[in-house]
Amino acid sequence: MVSPLKVPRMARPLEAPKSKDKILFSADGFGKFGALDVEEDWACEARRYYFGIVGKYGTPVQNLLKKAANFEIEKICPLHGPILTENLGYYLNLYNIWSSYSVESEGVVIAYTSVYGNTKKAALKLAEILKEKGCSKVTVTDLARDDFAEAIEDAFRYGKLVLATTTYNSDVFPFMRSFVDGLRERQYQNRTIG
């Protein structure tokens, strides 16, 4: 027998184990994008899924993690993605990092838009300088051409974000505006922004 853990603002309630089965039916929690018949690293697609689907609900997820800590869990069954049966501490730790808006890895994301290529040159030059100065991870994202969800994912993964853009009709370039709005909608915080 299972009973639901009420988590406000989650698409579906998570169900906590109450029997000997020790299964957490996690609804959208611990889900990920991708096919189940393809072996791949869980974290990348789960991170993208989290910040695309669940990310703005960090506080309710934190509350859920606290409630779930009172149960012995041997299996996590999300609606989307594989059933998790091994090294559950790894998955729970990542969810704790993501839902508390903590930095997962040190690194810099340079997100840019460029109309004539000059802002792109500046972004690439900055990436080169950062690498020369010893920054171990630098990711450069062209917001007009690269995957939007991956840009959001990287912004939440790393501790520093640099935004480089042009103006458009006396305003922020539309792709940059969409990116900033996407970060704001997901409660982006605890990062250094330049």
Predicted features, each with a name:
Residues 1-86:
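Metallo-beta-lactamase
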Residues 23, 108-110, 193:
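Conserved hydrophobic helix-helix packing surfaces used for dimerization/oligomerization
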Residues 77-104, 178-179:
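Short N-terminal or domain-adjacent regulatory/targeting segments
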Residues 93, 140-146:
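Short gly/ser/thr-rich secondary-structure transition/capping motifs
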Residues 114-116, 167:
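Residue-level signal for short, function-critical loop segments
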Residues 119-123, 127, 176:
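Short, highly selective alpha-helical patches that border small-molecule cofactor pockets
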Residues 124-139:
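Short helix-loop-beta junction
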Residues 145-194:
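Helix-loop-strand module that forms the ligand-binding subsite of alpha/beta enzymes
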